[in-house]
Every structure is written in C-alpha cells, then in structure tokens.
Regions:
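Hydrophobic transmembrane alpha-helices and their helix-loop junctions in integral membrane proteins
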Residues: 1-196
C-alpha cells in the first residue's frame, strides 16, 4: 500500500507541475510551447520543485524512498531487476526533462541545482547507512539503489548549478557523469537483483 500512496502523491505533484506550465503557456500541453514560454522565476521554480518531488517519488529519493525497500523483497527477482534497473531511472529522466528542457527558456536557477545536490547527498549517505544495517539481500540492494540515485542526483544538481553560473564545461562534465552512472547503475543493479 505504501508504493500505491507514494506513486499517487508523485503523480499528483507531476500533474500539478504540468498543469501550472500549461496554464502559463497559453493552455497548451505541447512540450514545444513549454520550451518557448519564458516563465517568471517564481512560476518556473514552482514547476521545477513540484516536478522534482513528483519524479523524486518515482526515483526513490529520501524522504520519498519508503516504498523501495518494501517493494523489492515482495517482488520476484526479475521484477526487482526491472524496477531498479529501469523504472526508477524514469524519475531521473523526468527531473532532467523538466529542469533542463521544458523550462529552458526561463533559465536554470542556481538554487535548483543546490537543492538537487542536497537531496542527492542525503539520499546517498542515508541510503548506504541503511544498506549497511540490512541482512535481507533484496532490501540491501533497494537501499543501495537509493544511494546510487543520490549519487546520480549529485551530478545532475552540479550540472544545473554550473549551467546557471554559465560554467558550460563543468555543466557538461557533471551531466555526462550523471548520465554515465545512470546507465551503469541500470546495468549492474539489474544483474545483482537477478542473482539475489
């Protein structure tokens, strides 16, 4: 039931973000219109924060991670491999899509990147701390996924902050590192769950 609740809370936050963008983009749901609209900094920030926590619930960031260690032990290993290897990466994609693409005309703000890095750091440190206390292999791997999502978010946040400060080289390097680790985690975590 916890996954059901968190998934629906995430859905409501994502919908609120997209409905806000639609409202300020002339009533259009087209991504091209979102990209072309220069939202005010306040509206862009509201849209990003809603999307971040909505997609963060899908990705399993702390404090929205509670469903991961409960769902993985209940699911068959092949389903856990798919969930951790693929499904939670959709949350990362959503954060990147909204923050770096759909709100691009409004410009990325430094504090967005800092917020993403703070939640990434919290998720990575607490994820590994919880994993060290686990004796159930699937729960351990679930907390390990929380940690790795945190590491990925550190790169995403660093990229956003650097982009806002016009440090293009650092922004590209941080984003490449985040995307590389996203792919890396998708490959090895699926294998670990299949072996669990």
């Amino acid at each position: 039931w916890l996954y059901f609740v968190i998934a629906h809370v995430g859905f409501v936050l994502i919908m609120a973000s997209f409905l806000t963008m639609t409202n300020f983009a002339g009533g259009s749901f087209a991504f091209a219109d979102f990209r072309a609209t220069q939202f005010s900094p306040a509206v862009a920030s509201v849209c990003f924060v809603l999307a971040f926590f909505g997609f963060g619930a899908k990705a399993g960031i702390i404090p929205l991670h509670g469903w991961l260690p409960k769902a993985h032990p209940e699911a068959p290993s092949n389903v856990s491999a798919l969930m951790s290897g693929g499904m939670i990466k959709i949350g990362i994609f959503g954060i990147l899509k909204v923050g770096l693409d759909l709100l691009s005309a409004s410009g990325v703000q430094v504090w967005w990147g800092l917020m993403v890095m703070v939640f990434g750091a919290i998720s990575s440190v607490l994820g590994v701390a919880f994993a060290l206390q686990e004796h159930d292999i699937k729960r351990l791997l679930a907390y390990h996924s929380v940690e790795n999502i945190g590491i990925i978010l550190l790169g995403v946040g660093a990229s956003m902050a650097a982009m806002a400060l016009n440090s293009v080289g650092i922004a590209v390097l941080a984003l490449m590192a985040a995307l590389y680790h996203t792919f890396n985690h998708a490959m090895f975590k699926g294998e670990l769950f299949l072996g669990a």
